Amino acid sequence: MARVKRGVVAHAKHKKVLEQAKGFYGRRKNTIRAAKAAVDKAGQYAYRDRKVRKRNFRSLWIQRINAAARLEGFTYSRFIFGLEKAGIEMDRKVLADIAGNDPAGFKAIADKVRAALA
């Protein structure tokens, strides 16, 4: 069996890591050992922050709904309770969008909530 020299494979692996490290600062962009560590850590941050992004957006939507609900005389929790009682099934993303872009529409929803709570 012929001897296989691994130079081509190693070069390809190194090239792949260095391409992923493009734009990094200092040694992290051109030294294979530092680049590999930096790329691994970047992957960990990316994985974690894909989860955190979902939390952050939900929090933002809640803040926007709360602000709009308070203009209508509700607290956030009373408003959400009223939505459930009125049978309005709308997620927080859509409610936040309506609150920001269609104040008249949000007022109509708030009126239905007010009627359901009365």
From Swiss-Prot:
Record bears the keyword Transcription: no
Protein name: Large ribosomal subunit protein bL20
Family of the protein in this entry: Belongs to the bacterial ribosomal protein bL20 family.
GO MF annotation terms: rRNA binding; structural constituent of ribosome
Gene Ontology biological process terms from the UniProt entry: ribosomal large subunit assembly; translation
Classification via PANTHER family: 39S RIBOSOMAL PROTEIN L20
GO cellular component, one term: ribonucleoprotein complex
Protein keywords: Ribonucleoprotein, Ribosomal protein, RNA-binding, rRNA-binding
Highest rank taxon of the organism: Bacteria
Function: Binds directly to 23S ribosomal RNA and is necessary for the in vitro assembly process of the 50S ribosomal subunit. It is not involved in the protein synthesizing functions of that subunit.
